[in-house]
Structure formats: C-alpha cells, structure tokens
A protein has these predicted regions:
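Cys-dependent protein tyrosine phosphatase-like superfamily
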Residues: 1-102, 107, 115-163
C-alpha cells in the first residue's frame, strides 16, 4: 500500500459510501476491491498524481473491474453548484443501484467530504451542516475548508429553490 494511501486512509461515511485518499498503485486499488468497492468517483486533477501513478491506477481499476468517473476539481479550490450536483447525482444513482461507491480527492478531507455531505443530506433529508457532522463522526479527518462549506450551502440553497 502506498504511504499516502495508508496515512490518509478511507472510511465509510454512509451506507455504501466510502470517502478517502486517492489510490496511487495496484496495491491501493486491491485494498478498495477488498472492501467491495464497485464504483469510484474521482475528484483529483491529473497534476496531483506522481509520474506514472495515474496510468497504474487506471490499469489496476480495469483489472479489478472497478468503474471510475472523474470530475477534476482544484485541490483547496472552490466547488461550483453544477460540479457538486453532478458528483452528488452520479454517486446517488450508483448507490440507488446497489453499488458500493468510493468518493475520493487527494487526502479525503475536503473535496470528497463536501460532496459526501451533499449525498448524506439528500439521502437522510437533513441539512448539509448536520450531514458534515455525521461524516466527521465516521471519518474525523473529513473537514472541508470554510469556502467549500459555503459552496455546499450555496448548492443546497439553489437546489431547494428549484423544487
């Protein structure tokens, strides 16, 4: 297992939804396979990977039969409402279909926690701030930056207004 993946790890934050660090090699992907991950939603940019790591992960995912979708978001950056909506809806569809979903950013602390809070808020019919609290109970390192929390609340408000 890569040092990064071992250090930052992952955790199940809701039924069927696991968030964490980005896998960097075949051993990291094998660890995800061992916990029955069937789909990955990747929020990492190509530039965040070490040389050759992205290609190794793609090959390992294919070999493991794990499907991946990506939405490259800037590390430490903001999340637009449309980006949150896409990631949340995709993961929600997968979860509804019985998939076990791994949602990751680089360390599993910020971008992935923000999107996971949107998923938990919708699934549990709770406010996003409460969803973040639940996620932190299950994965204490999950802590979106202040501007990412604001992005989540902006998305939530816009979504509610459309109903």
């Amino acid at each position: 297992m890569s040092d990064w993946f071992e250090h930052f790890g992952y955790g199940e934050v809701a039924e069927g939804l696991v968030i964490g660090a980005y896998p960097q090699d075949v051993v990291d992907v094998a660890a995800l396979s061992q916990v029955s991950i069937t789909r990955i939603f990747n929020l990492v940019q190509d530039a965040e990977y070490d040389d050759g790591a992205r290609a190794a992960v793609v090959a390992a995912l294919e070999d493991a039969g794990i499907d991946e979708q990506r939405l490259e978001l800037i590390d430490y950056g903001g999340l637009l409402p449309g980006q949150i909506e896409l990631a949340v809806n995709t993961a929600m569809d997968w979860l509804h279909d019985g998939e076990r979903v791994y949602l990751h950013c680089r360390a599993g602390w910020q971008r992935s926690a923000t999107v996971a809070a949107g998923i938990v808020a919708l699934r549990e019919d709770i406010e996003p701030e409460r969803a973040l609290e639940l996620i932190r109970e299950r994965k204490p390192t999950a802590k979106p930056l202040a501007h990412q929390r604001r992005d989540l609340l902006r998305w939530w408000t816009m979504r509610k207004q459309k109903r």
